[in-house]
């Protein structure tokens, strides 16, 4: 049996005491398997308790821990495990899988929608399938616009339009355009900055020097928002800075 655990906020003992779990042996083996998903959500103290449990039952159990950030797993656990790292899937692999899922579920998936799913998933197949599932729950025909709206992602051309407004139209039009993107796609300020940064390399109307300067402005804005700065004010400041850097 593979046990999938929810992220624990209060530690191993509290979660374990909430319900009784009976494990069956895996066929063909002499031990039991426990799978802990999102193990990096455990606090250091909870991981310390888990380490002791792993040692106590090492003769009868095998523990599999999955995480997004191995740096958040304490060294005492890492040193007792064989570490396997999985890279993001290639775009063609994600495309093939979501088309297969759509076909199996009788979902009409437009080609541009498939490309949008590949774009927003960043090689994460779980995210890709979830995006397809959410869109399909709203319409039997999954379109590109529907994917971007349901995943809270601004299309690349919209992001490029904001930067073009900074370059040619000035502060107020660019500011209105950015606010429109935030409202339309339900984006947080940090999400907007990250998406702008991701798409910056594909912007043809900026030279390398301008892209470097814009990247620095985005980094400063992201840092200030993470540190607690007001989102609206920081985004306005970023827009003003970008306009001064690349504007006519």
Regions found by a protein language model. Give the residues of each.
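Helix-rich C-terminal "collar"/helical-bundle subdomain used as an assembly and partner-interaction module
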Residues: 161-248
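Conserved AAA+ ATPase "SRH/arginine-finger" region at the nucleotide-binding site
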Residues: 68, 82-95
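Short conserved motifs of the RecA-like P-loop NTPase core
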Residues: 31, 95-97, 108-120, 142-148, ...
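Conserved catalytic/switch belt of AAA+ P-loop NTPases
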Residues: 18-26, 36, 40-79
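Short glycine-rich substrate-engagement loop in P-loop NTPases that contacts/grips substrate
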Residues: 1-32
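Short glycine-/polar-rich loops that comprise or flank the Walker A/P-loop
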Residues: 30-31, 58-61, 78-82, 123, ...
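Residue-level signature of catalytic and energy-coupling elements of molecular machines
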Residues: 15, 50, 66, 81, ...
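C-terminal helical "lid" of AAA+/P-loop NTPase domains
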Residues: 114-120, 126-140, 148, 163-164, ...
